[in-house]
Regions:
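Domain-level signal for Mg2+-assisted phosphodiester chemistry and nucleotide/NA-binding surfaces
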Residues: 1-99
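Nuclease catalytic cores that cleave nucleic-acid phosphodiester bonds
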Residues: 78-141
Length: 141
C-alpha cells in the first residue's frame, strides 16, 4: 500500500476556489478532497494544511477561525501557520498610503515540510494542492 501525504496551500486554495466557483466550495472538507484523489493501492497517512491567520480584519478573522475550527473538529488535518506582513502601498495619483497585508512563510513551510517528510520516508506519494508556481522547485527536488 502506497502511503500518501497531501500538502494544501490553504490561502491559494481558498482564493482559487473563490475565483472559480464564488462561494460554492468555501466550506470544503480538505481531508475528503485528499481521499478523493487517491487511487486503488494508496492510503492517506496525513493531510497537512498550511495557512496564515488573518489579522486586523475582524470579519475575515472570524470566518477563517470558524472554518479552521470546523476542520480541526471534523478531520485529522495537521495545521502549519505562516504570518502576514503588512506592507505600505502608496497611491502615486493621490499620495495616500494604506496597509496591504501579504502572506509570508506558507511556501517555505510547505517546501520544508515536504522535504523533511521525503527525507524521513514518511510518504511514497506526495500530493500538493496549490496553484503557486513558487513550489515547483521543491517538487522537482
Amino acid at each position: 500500500m502506497q502511503r500518501v501525504i497531501t500538502y494544501i496551500d490553504g490561502f491559494n486554495l481558498y482564493f482559487g476556489m473563490k475565483a472559480q466557483y464564488n462561494n460554492k466550495y468555501l466550506w470544503l472538507d480538505v481531508e475528503a478532497l485528499s481521499n478523493s484523489l487517491l487511487i486503488p493501492g494508496q492510503s492517506l497517512v496525513a493531510t497537512k494544511y498550511f495557512t496564515s491567520m488573518v489579522t486586523n480584519q475582524p470579519d475575515k478573522e472570524k470566518r477563517q477561525r470558524t472554518y479552521l475550527d470546523a476542520l480541526k473538529s471534523s478531520t485529522g488535518c495537521l495545521f502549519y501557520y505562516g504570518r502576514y506582513q503588512s506592507n505600505i502601498i502608496n497611491c502615486r495619483g493621490c499620495g495616500s498610503n494604506w496597509p496591504s497585508p501579504k502572506e509570508k512563510m506558507t511556501d517555505v513551510n510547505i517546501a520544508t515540510q515536504m522535504l523533511m517528510d521525503a527525507f524521513t520516508d514518511k510518504f511514497d506519494v506526495a500530493i500538493l494542492i496549490s496553484g503557486d508556481t513558487d513550489l515547483i522547485p521543491p517538487i522537482e527536488a
